[in-house]
Amino acid sequence: MRAIYLDNKIKGAINQLINYFIEGVFDCNNTKVIFKYYKESFLYYKRQLKKYKINHEYFFSVNKLDMSSYKVVFYLFNAQSNCRILTYRNAKHIFITHGESNKLASIKPIIRIYDYVVCAGDAGVSRYLENGIFSRYDVENHRIIKMGDTFIGKSVFKKISDKKNAYILYAPTWEGGIKSEQYSSLSEDLYAFKTIQKYAQKSDIKKIIIQAHPNTGHRDKKYRKYLNQGIKFLKSYNLEVENMGIYNHKTSFLNKFFLKRSSKDIYPIYQAFVDISAMEIQLLNEYIPIFIFINKTKNAIVNKQILKDYYDKITIQSDVIQTESVKELEQIKDFYIGYSFDELKSMTKNKRVDWLVDFVSKENYGNKI
Protein backbone atom coordinates (compact mmCIF):
# COMPACT_ATOMS: atom_id res chain seq x y z
CA MET A 1 0.00 0.00 0.00
CA ARG A 2 1.15 3.54 -0.79
CA ALA A 3 0.34 6.74 1.03
CA ILE A 4 0.18 10.41 0.11
CA TYR A 5 0.84 12.51 3.20
CA LEU A 6 -0.74 15.95 3.45
CA ASP A 7 -0.31 18.49 6.24
CA ASN A 8 -1.88 21.59 4.73
CA LYS A 9 -4.85 23.74 5.71
CA ILE A 10 -5.27 25.48 2.35
CA LYS A 11 -8.38 24.22 0.58
CA GLY A 12 -6.79 24.39 -2.85
CA ALA A 13 -4.16 21.84 -1.81
CA ILE A 14 -6.60 18.94 -1.79
CA ASN A 15 -7.80 19.78 -5.30
CA GLN A 16 -4.23 19.79 -6.57
CA LEU A 17 -3.76 16.36 -5.01
CA ILE A 18 -7.05 14.98 -6.33
CA ASN A 19 -6.12 16.02 -9.86
CA TYR A 20 -3.45 13.31 -9.84
CA PHE A 21 -6.15 10.70 -9.21
CA ILE A 22 -8.44 12.19 -11.86
CA GLU A 23 -5.59 12.14 -14.34
CA GLY A 24 -4.82 8.51 -13.49
CA VAL A 25 -1.36 9.11 -12.04
CA PHE A 26 -2.36 7.61 -8.70
CA ASP A 27 -4.65 4.61 -8.30
CA CYS A 28 -7.45 4.65 -5.73
CA ASN A 29 -7.02 0.90 -5.30
CA ASN A 30 -3.50 1.02 -3.90
CA THR A 31 -3.02 4.58 -2.62
CA LYS A 32 -4.44 6.22 0.50
CA VAL A 33 -4.46 9.94 1.29
CA ILE A 34 -3.48 10.68 4.89
CA PHE A 35 -4.19 14.25 5.94
CA LYS A 36 -4.00 16.29 9.11
CA TYR A 37 -7.17 17.66 10.67
CA TYR A 38 -7.57 21.42 10.48
CA LYS A 39 -10.82 23.07 11.46
CA GLU A 40 -10.68 25.42 8.45
CA SER A 41 -10.40 22.72 5.82
CA PHE A 42 -11.43 19.36 7.27
CA LEU A 43 -14.99 19.18 5.94
CA TYR A 44 -13.93 20.42 2.52
CA TYR A 45 -11.10 17.86 2.29
CA LYS A 46 -13.41 15.09 3.44
CA ARG A 47 -16.13 16.03 0.97
CA GLN A 48 -13.76 16.26 -2.00
CA LEU A 49 -12.03 12.94 -1.28
CA LYS A 50 -15.36 11.21 -0.81
CA LYS A 51 -16.67 12.72 -4.05
CA TYR A 52 -13.88 11.05 -6.04
CA LYS A 53 -13.99 7.84 -3.98
CA ILE A 54 -10.40 8.22 -2.83
CA ASN A 55 -9.35 6.10 0.14
CA HIS A 56 -8.36 8.43 2.96
CA GLU A 57 -7.62 8.80 6.65
CA TYR A 58 -7.23 11.86 8.84
CA PHE A 59 -5.37 12.39 12.10
CA PHE A 60 -5.18 14.92 14.91
CA SER A 61 -1.71 14.15 16.22
CA VAL A 62 1.17 12.80 14.17
CA ASN A 63 2.36 10.94 17.27
CA LYS A 64 -0.69 8.68 17.09
CA LEU A 65 -0.38 7.96 13.39
CA ASP A 66 0.51 4.41 12.36
CA MET A 67 2.44 4.34 9.08
CA SER A 68 3.78 0.80 9.38
CA SER A 69 1.70 -0.63 6.54
CA TYR A 70 3.04 1.69 3.82
CA LYS A 71 5.82 0.78 1.44
CA VAL A 72 6.16 4.27 -0.02
CA VAL A 73 5.00 7.69 1.17
CA PHE A 74 4.57 10.52 -1.34
CA TYR A 75 4.68 14.23 -0.46
CA LEU A 76 3.30 17.09 -2.57
CA PHE A 77 3.94 19.88 -0.07
CA ASN A 78 6.58 20.61 2.54
CA ALA A 79 5.47 20.80 6.18
CA GLN A 80 7.18 20.53 9.55
CA SER A 81 5.38 17.30 10.38
CA ASN A 82 6.85 15.70 7.25
CA CYS A 83 10.08 15.40 9.25
CA ARG A 84 8.26 13.27 11.81
CA ILE A 85 6.80 10.97 9.16
CA LEU A 86 10.26 10.45 7.69
CA THR A 87 11.29 8.66 10.88
CA TYR A 88 9.19 5.71 9.68
CA ARG A 89 12.05 3.88 8.00
CA ASN A 90 9.94 0.93 6.88
CA ALA A 91 8.89 3.13 3.96
CA LYS A 92 10.70 5.12 1.30
CA HIS A 93 9.81 8.79 1.24
CA ILE A 94 9.44 10.57 -2.11
CA PHE A 95 8.89 14.28 -2.67
CA ILE A 96 7.03 14.76 -5.94
CA THR A 97 6.00 18.42 -5.40
CA HIS A 98 2.81 19.61 -7.16
CA GLY A 99 4.11 20.89 -10.46
CA GLU A 100 7.40 22.03 -12.00
CA SER A 101 8.27 25.72 -11.80
CA ASN A 102 11.03 28.31 -11.55
CA LYS A 103 9.75 29.61 -8.21
CA LEU A 104 11.98 29.96 -5.15
CA ALA A 105 9.83 27.37 -3.38
CA SER A 106 11.28 24.72 -5.69
CA ILE A 107 14.76 25.06 -4.15
CA LYS A 108 14.07 25.15 -0.42
CA PRO A 109 16.77 23.26 1.54
CA ILE A 110 14.10 21.21 3.36
CA ILE A 111 13.79 19.17 0.17
CA ARG A 112 17.01 17.38 1.21
CA ILE A 113 15.19 15.48 3.96
CA TYR A 114 13.45 13.07 1.57
CA ASP A 115 14.89 9.78 0.40
CA TYR A 116 14.09 10.59 -3.22
CA VAL A 117 13.01 13.70 -5.08
CA VAL A 118 11.18 13.69 -8.40
CA CYS A 119 11.63 16.43 -10.96
CA ALA A 120 10.44 16.77 -14.56
CA GLY A 121 13.79 16.96 -16.33
CA ASP A 122 17.23 18.50 -16.66
CA ALA A 123 16.01 21.99 -15.73
CA GLY A 124 14.94 20.67 -12.33
CA VAL A 125 18.23 18.84 -11.80
CA SER A 126 20.19 21.98 -12.73
CA ARG A 127 18.14 24.03 -10.26
CA TYR A 128 19.08 21.69 -7.41
CA LEU A 129 22.77 21.54 -8.33
CA GLU A 130 23.25 25.26 -8.96
CA ASN A 131 21.65 26.16 -5.64
CA GLY A 132 23.52 23.56 -3.60
CA ILE A 133 20.44 21.57 -2.67
CA PHE A 134 21.87 18.31 -4.03
CA SER A 135 25.24 17.11 -5.28
CA ARG A 136 26.46 15.29 -8.37
CA TYR A 137 26.67 12.21 -6.18
CA ASP A 138 22.94 12.46 -5.48
CA VAL A 139 22.21 12.72 -9.19
CA GLU A 140 24.49 9.84 -10.15
CA ASN A 141 22.92 7.63 -7.49
CA HIS A 142 19.38 8.48 -8.61
CA ARG A 143 18.32 10.26 -5.49
CA ILE A 144 16.86 12.75 -7.96
CA ILE A 145 14.70 10.97 -10.51
CA LYS A 146 13.53 12.62 -13.72
CA MET A 147 9.95 11.52 -14.37
CA GLY A 148 9.08 13.74 -17.34
CA ASP A 149 5.47 14.91 -17.47
CA THR A 150 4.23 12.41 -14.88
CA PHE A 151 3.61 14.95 -12.13
CA ILE A 152 3.47 18.29 -13.98
CA GLY A 153 -0.29 18.10 -14.42
CA LYS A 154 -2.42 17.98 -17.54
CA SER A 155 -4.57 20.85 -18.69
CA VAL A 156 -7.86 20.88 -20.58
CA PHE A 157 -6.38 23.14 -23.23
CA LYS A 158 -5.15 22.50 -26.74
CA LYS A 159 -3.17 24.62 -29.15
CA ILE A 160 -5.07 26.12 -32.06
CA SER A 161 -3.74 28.35 -34.84
CA ASP A 162 -7.13 29.49 -36.12
CA LYS A 163 -8.35 32.56 -34.23
CA LYS A 164 -11.98 31.79 -34.98
CA ASN A 165 -13.64 30.40 -31.84
CA ALA A 166 -10.27 30.43 -30.07
CA TYR A 167 -9.62 31.62 -26.52
CA ILE A 168 -6.94 33.64 -24.84
CA LEU A 169 -5.99 31.95 -21.58
CA TYR A 170 -4.98 33.91 -18.50
CA ALA A 171 -3.65 31.75 -15.66
CA PRO A 172 -2.36 33.93 -12.82
CA THR A 173 -0.63 32.23 -9.92
CA TRP A 174 -1.37 33.06 -6.27
CA GLU A 175 0.43 35.59 -4.08
CA GLY A 176 2.55 32.98 -2.32
CA GLY A 177 2.91 32.11 1.34
CA ILE A 178 5.43 34.92 1.94
CA LYS A 179 6.11 38.20 0.12
CA SER A 180 9.41 37.06 -1.37
CA GLU A 181 7.50 34.29 -3.15
CA GLN A 182 4.91 36.62 -4.68
CA TYR A 183 4.83 35.82 -8.41
CA SER A 184 1.25 36.81 -9.17
CA SER A 185 0.54 39.30 -11.95
CA LEU A 186 -2.75 40.25 -10.30
CA SER A 187 -2.36 43.87 -9.23
CA GLU A 188 -4.27 46.98 -8.25
CA ASP A 189 -3.47 48.73 -11.53
CA LEU A 190 -4.91 45.76 -13.50
CA TYR A 191 -1.80 45.75 -15.67
CA ALA A 192 -2.16 42.11 -16.74
CA PHE A 193 -5.82 42.54 -17.68
CA LYS A 194 -5.06 45.70 -19.66
CA THR A 195 -2.28 43.91 -21.51
CA ILE A 196 -4.58 41.00 -22.35
CA GLN A 197 -7.34 43.36 -23.48
CA LYS A 198 -4.96 45.11 -25.89
CA TYR A 199 -3.75 41.77 -27.23
CA ALA A 200 -7.33 40.53 -27.67
CA GLN A 201 -8.26 43.69 -29.56
CA LYS A 202 -5.20 43.49 -31.79
CA SER A 203 -5.75 39.78 -32.47
CA ASP A 204 -9.52 40.12 -32.91
CA ILE A 205 -10.22 37.41 -30.31
CA LYS A 206 -13.35 37.85 -28.23
CA LYS A 207 -13.10 34.98 -25.76
CA ILE A 208 -11.03 34.97 -22.58
CA ILE A 209 -10.77 32.03 -20.22
CA ILE A 210 -9.38 32.50 -16.74
CA GLN A 211 -7.81 29.79 -14.62
CA ALA A 212 -6.73 31.47 -11.40
CA HIS A 213 -4.64 29.50 -8.92
CA PRO A 214 -6.93 27.85 -6.33
CA ASN A 215 -4.99 29.49 -3.47
CA THR A 216 -5.52 33.03 -4.75
CA GLY A 217 -6.26 35.34 -1.84
CA HIS A 218 -5.25 32.88 0.86
CA ARG A 219 -2.45 35.08 2.25
CA ASP A 220 -3.83 38.40 1.07
CA LYS A 221 -7.51 38.79 0.22
CA LYS A 222 -6.93 41.82 -1.95
CA TYR A 223 -5.75 39.52 -4.75
CA ARG A 224 -9.30 38.21 -5.03
CA LYS A 225 -10.43 41.82 -5.37
CA TYR A 226 -7.89 42.40 -8.15
CA LEU A 227 -9.23 39.34 -9.96
CA ASN A 228 -12.80 40.57 -9.54
CA GLN A 229 -11.97 44.04 -10.84
CA GLY A 230 -9.95 42.65 -13.74
CA ILE A 231 -12.84 40.50 -14.89
CA LYS A 232 -15.18 43.49 -14.85
CA PHE A 233 -12.59 45.45 -16.82
CA LEU A 234 -12.42 42.79 -19.56
CA LYS A 235 -16.19 42.57 -19.74
CA SER A 236 -16.43 46.34 -20.12
CA TYR A 237 -14.72 45.85 -23.50
CA ASN A 238 -17.40 43.34 -24.53
CA LEU A 239 -15.07 40.39 -24.11
CA GLU A 240 -16.64 37.08 -23.21
CA VAL A 241 -15.01 35.88 -20.00
CA GLU A 242 -15.31 32.27 -18.87
CA ASN A 243 -14.23 30.52 -15.70
CA MET A 244 -12.45 27.19 -15.55
CA GLY A 245 -14.25 26.37 -12.32
CA ILE A 246 -11.15 25.84 -10.19
CA TYR A 247 -11.38 29.18 -8.46
CA ASN A 248 -14.71 28.80 -6.74
CA HIS A 249 -14.36 28.02 -3.04
CA LYS A 250 -15.14 31.15 -0.99
CA THR A 251 -15.59 33.10 -4.23
CA SER A 252 -18.72 31.73 -5.82
CA PHE A 253 -19.85 35.33 -6.24
CA LEU A 254 -17.39 35.59 -9.11
CA ASN A 255 -19.05 32.71 -10.88
CA LYS A 256 -22.52 33.98 -10.15
CA PHE A 257 -22.13 37.62 -11.14
CA PHE A 258 -19.14 38.02 -13.41
CA LEU A 259 -18.18 34.77 -15.08
CA LYS A 260 -19.82 32.48 -17.54
CA ARG A 261 -19.26 28.88 -16.49
CA SER A 262 -18.38 26.53 -19.32
CA SER A 263 -18.75 22.77 -19.59
CA LYS A 264 -16.36 22.26 -22.49
CA ASP A 265 -14.02 19.29 -22.20
CA ILE A 266 -11.29 20.95 -24.23
CA TYR A 267 -10.61 24.64 -24.71
CA PRO A 268 -8.87 25.76 -27.93
CA ILE A 269 -6.18 28.26 -26.95
CA TYR A 270 -4.57 30.66 -29.38
CA GLN A 271 -2.35 32.34 -26.80
CA ALA A 272 -1.77 31.97 -23.06
CA PHE A 273 -0.63 34.53 -20.50
CA VAL A 274 0.93 33.08 -17.35
CA ASP A 275 3.12 33.94 -14.37
CA ILE A 276 6.20 32.16 -13.04
CA SER A 277 4.40 28.97 -12.06
CA ALA A 278 3.81 25.33 -12.92
CA MET A 279 1.40 26.45 -15.66
CA GLU A 280 4.38 27.60 -17.72
CA ILE A 281 5.85 24.10 -18.02
CA GLN A 282 2.44 22.43 -18.27
CA LEU A 283 1.46 24.53 -21.28
CA LEU A 284 4.90 24.17 -22.85
CA ASN A 285 4.44 20.41 -22.70
CA GLU A 286 1.24 20.85 -24.72
CA TYR A 287 2.88 23.26 -27.21
CA ILE A 288 0.55 26.11 -26.28
CA PRO A 289 2.31 29.45 -26.91
CA ILE A 290 2.77 31.56 -23.80
CA PHE A 291 3.66 35.06 -22.74
CA ILE A 292 4.88 35.42 -19.18
CA PHE A 293 4.43 38.22 -16.67
CA ILE A 294 7.37 38.80 -14.34
CA ASN A 295 6.48 41.16 -11.50
CA LYS A 296 8.69 43.51 -9.49
CA THR A 297 10.16 40.76 -7.29
CA LYS A 298 12.05 39.45 -10.34
CA ASN A 299 13.05 36.30 -8.49
CA ALA A 300 12.56 33.66 -11.15
CA ILE A 301 15.22 30.94 -11.02
CA VAL A 302 16.46 31.14 -14.58
CA ASN A 303 20.23 30.64 -14.65
CA LYS A 304 20.91 28.55 -17.73
CA GLN A 305 21.52 30.53 -20.92
CA ILE A 306 19.00 28.44 -22.84
CA LEU A 307 16.27 29.61 -20.44
CA LYS A 308 17.50 33.21 -20.33
CA ASP A 309 17.22 33.40 -24.12
CA TYR A 310 13.79 31.78 -23.98
CA TYR A 311 12.55 34.22 -21.33
CA ASP A 312 13.83 37.16 -23.37
CA LYS A 313 11.35 36.11 -26.05
CA ILE A 314 8.30 35.29 -23.94
CA THR A 315 8.49 37.86 -21.14
CA ILE A 316 6.18 40.85 -21.47
CA GLN A 317 8.31 43.99 -21.35
CA SER A 318 6.33 47.09 -20.37
CA ASP A 319 3.42 47.34 -22.82
CA VAL A 320 5.32 45.65 -25.63
CA ILE A 321 4.37 42.10 -26.57
CA GLN A 322 6.93 40.25 -28.62
CA THR A 323 5.63 38.47 -31.70
CA GLU A 324 8.84 36.59 -32.42
CA SER A 325 8.30 32.85 -32.57
CA VAL A 326 10.43 30.54 -30.45
CA LYS A 327 12.28 28.35 -32.92
CA GLU A 328 14.01 26.35 -30.19
CA LEU A 329 10.72 25.28 -28.57
CA GLU A 330 11.43 21.54 -28.86
CA GLN A 331 14.87 22.05 -27.33
CA ILE A 332 13.35 24.06 -24.47
CA LYS A 333 10.74 21.40 -23.87
CA ASP A 334 13.39 18.66 -23.81
CA PHE A 335 15.35 20.66 -21.23
CA TYR A 336 12.32 20.95 -18.96
CA ILE A 337 10.90 17.47 -19.52
CA GLY A 338 12.97 14.28 -19.65
CA TYR A 339 13.47 10.90 -18.05
CA SER A 340 16.20 9.28 -15.98
CA PHE A 341 15.51 6.00 -17.77
CA ASP A 342 14.40 5.72 -21.41
CA GLU A 343 11.84 3.02 -20.61
CA LEU A 344 9.74 5.52 -18.64
CA LYS A 345 8.85 7.65 -21.65
CA SER A 346 6.66 5.03 -23.30
CA MET A 347 4.82 4.09 -20.09
CA THR A 348 1.45 5.44 -19.00
CA LYS A 349 1.66 7.72 -15.98
CA ASN A 350 0.26 5.20 -13.53
CA LYS A 351 2.74 2.60 -14.79
CA ARG A 352 5.54 5.07 -14.20
CA VAL A 353 4.39 5.39 -10.58
CA ASP A 354 4.39 1.59 -10.28
CA TRP A 355 7.91 1.60 -11.70
CA LEU A 356 8.98 4.31 -9.24
CA VAL A 357 7.62 2.40 -6.25
CA ASP A 358 9.40 -0.75 -7.39
CA PHE A 359 12.64 1.15 -8.09
CA VAL A 360 12.91 2.90 -4.71
CA SER A 361 11.90 -0.27 -2.88
CA LYS A 362 14.91 -2.06 -4.35
CA GLU A 363 17.33 0.87 -3.94
CA ASN A 364 19.18 1.46 -0.70
CA TYR A 365 19.90 5.17 -0.99
CA GLY A 366 17.32 6.13 1.60
CA ASN A 367 19.05 3.93 4.16
CA LYS A 368 22.38 5.67 3.60
CA ILE A 369 21.26 9.12 4.66
Residue ranges and their predicted role:
Residues 61-65, 223-285:
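Donor nucleotide-activated moiety binding/catalytic core segment of transferases
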Residues 13-25, 150-236, 323, 350, ...:
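Conserved catalytic-core segment of nucleotide-activated headgroup transferases in glycan assembly
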Residues 30-40, 117-122, 209-213:
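Short internal beta-strands
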Residues 1-65, 365-369:
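N-terminal pre-catalytic "stem/leader" segment of glycosyltransferase-like enzymes
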Residues 89-154:
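Active-site-proximal region of nucleotide-activated glycan assembly enzymes
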Residues 41-111:
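Extended catalytic core of nucleotide-activated donor transferases of GT-like folds
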Residues 225, 269, 278-345:
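Catalytic binding pocket for nucleotide-activated donors in carbohydrate/polymer assembly enzymes
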Residues 332, 346-369:
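C-terminal alpha-helical cap of glycosyltransferases
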